[in-house]
């Protein structure tokens, strides 16, 4: 009954009994684990990257990952993307769900569009209780999900950066054991002539640790380009399911 209501596995803990009333705690179980790593590299001739990233593990069993790419390069781009992620984090701290938080943030950017400053946002919310992943994309790069069976699923951006579209692009995806998620800023793929070769390269590196995969992706991009045209940020996540006891 409890699992039907909560849509996830639960454990029941006895708290106390008073007269004819029994008090129980219903605790959702975590069914997936997430191992992750991230890396960032500025464009040529820049001391600082215009990309920023956010990784946050919440007490409610959710994990949040985000990449923001500020308009332009250098400190101005860094400031814009850094402010974007700080605003996201501040709104979520108010116990507002990510979907509402990002709608509020997007509205804020719509209102202040006269500033002519924009940032992309690639946001991922993973529910570790039921394995559901929700992707929010606002001008963001494609996210790749590498499967155990060698297939690759893609979450493709359908909207413009924050403050330009009134709607927030949102997609749900059910994660499975062995999935590997690659989030990146557009500097990674824009530098390459053939993105299919990058997919093949990542697929062959799938058995490596997440941090090593981050390094390999950045190094591959550098070696297979003429010039670093944009900042590059990569987040690699590996999903594993817990065995039922």
Residue ranges and their predicted role:
Residues 28-52, 106-110, 139-172, 218-219:
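PP2C/PPM family metal-dependent serine/threonine protein phosphatase catalytic domain
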């Amino acid at each position: 009954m409890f699992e039907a209501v909560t849509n996830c596995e639960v454990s029941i803990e006895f708290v106390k009994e008073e007269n004819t009333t029994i008090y129980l705690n219903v605790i959702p179980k975590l069914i997936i684990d997430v191992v992750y790593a991230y890396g960032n590299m500025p464009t040529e001739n820049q001391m600082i990257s215009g990309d920023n990233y956010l990784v946050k593990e919440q007490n409610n069993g959710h994990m949040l990952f985000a990449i923001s790419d500020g308009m332009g390069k250098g400190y101005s781009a860094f400031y814009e993307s850094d402010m974007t992620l700080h605003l996201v984090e501040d709104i979520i701290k108010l116990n507002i769900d990510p979907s509402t938080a990002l709608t509020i943030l997007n509205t804020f950017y719509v209102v202040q569009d006269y500033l002519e400053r924009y940032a992309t946002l690639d946001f991922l919310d993973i529910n570790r209780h039921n394995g559901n992943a929700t992707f929010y994309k606002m001008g963001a790069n494609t996210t790749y999900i590498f499967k155990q069976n060698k297939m690759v699923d893609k979450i493709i951006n359908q909207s413009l950066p924050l403050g330009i579209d009134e709607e927030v692009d949102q997609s749900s995806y059910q994660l499975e054991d062995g999935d590997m998620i690659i989030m990146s800023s557009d500097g990674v793929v824009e530098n390459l002539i053939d993105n299919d070769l990058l997919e093949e390269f990542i697929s062959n590196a799938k058995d490596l640790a997440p941090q090593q995969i981050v390094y390999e992706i950045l190094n591959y991009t550098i070696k297979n380009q003429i010039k670093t045209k944009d900042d590059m940020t990569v987040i690699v996540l590996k999903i594993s399911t817990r065995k039922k006891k």
